[in-house]
Amino acid sequence: MIDLGISKLALIGAVALIVIGPERLPKVARTVGALVGRAQRYINDVKAEVSREVELEELRKMRTEFENAARDVEQTIHKEVSEHTQALNEAFDGSASSSSSSDTGSGYVPSWDSAHKSHNGRKSWRVKQGARPIWFKRQQNTRMWVQSGAARVKRHRPASGRNRSFFE
């Protein structure tokens, strides 16, 4: 910006005192100070906006790079999965054709889900959770009878003589 030293400021003040006069000089100085402050705030706002735009542009660039990398990884994964699926289908077709020629059974092929359920023994998650003994639940501080907040308040509220309603 403009390089103003003490000697230049003193010269400007002396000229202003002569031209404007001692009566109006304080008012003019306040007005000039307000205008200079407003100009500085405007310049700072412009600088902040420019820096924000630069940051946003950098973030957009990083986002596009990240999206491209994610897309490449996704395509690679899909390609690998399709190759393995194709290899498994070919192996399954080959084993199915050889087993169908040697075995004339009912054609039942067990799925992984039924094998998992028969191996596990229990089908329901709640049954599995209920299989823990009560002494273990007490030791682990597991709640056995969960109660809502309203039910807990009703349970611990002192009994009154008559049943009150909100609308009475």
UniProtKB/Swiss-Prot annotation:
Belongs to the TatB family. It is a single-pass membrane protein. It comes from the Bacteria. The chain crosses the membrane at residues 1-21. GO terms for cellular component: TAT protein transport complex. Keywords: Cell inner membrane, Cell membrane, Membrane, Protein transport, Translocation, Transmembrane, Transmembrane helix, Transport. NCBIfam families: tatB (TIGR01410). One of its GO terms (biological process) is protein transport by the Tat complex. The lineage of its organism: Bacteria, Pseudomonadati, Pseudomonadota, Betaproteobacteria, Burkholderiales. It is found in: Cell inner membrane. The Tat system comprises two distinct complexes: a TatABC complex, containing multiple copies of TatA, TatB and TatC subunits, and a separate TatA complex, containing only TatA subunits. Substrates initially bind to the TatABC complex, which probably triggers association of the separate TatA complex to form the active translocon. It comes from Cupriavidus metallidurans (strain ATCC 43123 / DSM 2839 / NBRC 102507 / CH34) (Ralstonia metallidurans). Residues 92-132, 146-168 are annotated as: Disordered. GO terms for molecular function: protein transmembrane transporter activity. Residues 94-107 have a biased composition (Low complexity). Coiled coil: none annotated. InterPro entries: TatA/B/E, TatB. Pfam families: TatA_B_E. Residues 117-126 have a biased composition (Basic residues). Gene3D superfamilies: 1.20.5.3310. The keyword Transport applies. The keyword Protein transport applies. This is Sec-independent protein translocase protein TatB. Part of the twin-arginine translocation (Tat) system that transports large folded proteins containing a characteristic twin-arginine motif in their signal peptide across membranes. Together with TatC, TatB is part of a receptor directly interacting with Tat signal peptides. TatB may form an oligomeric binding site that transiently accommodates folded Tat precursor proteins before their translocation.
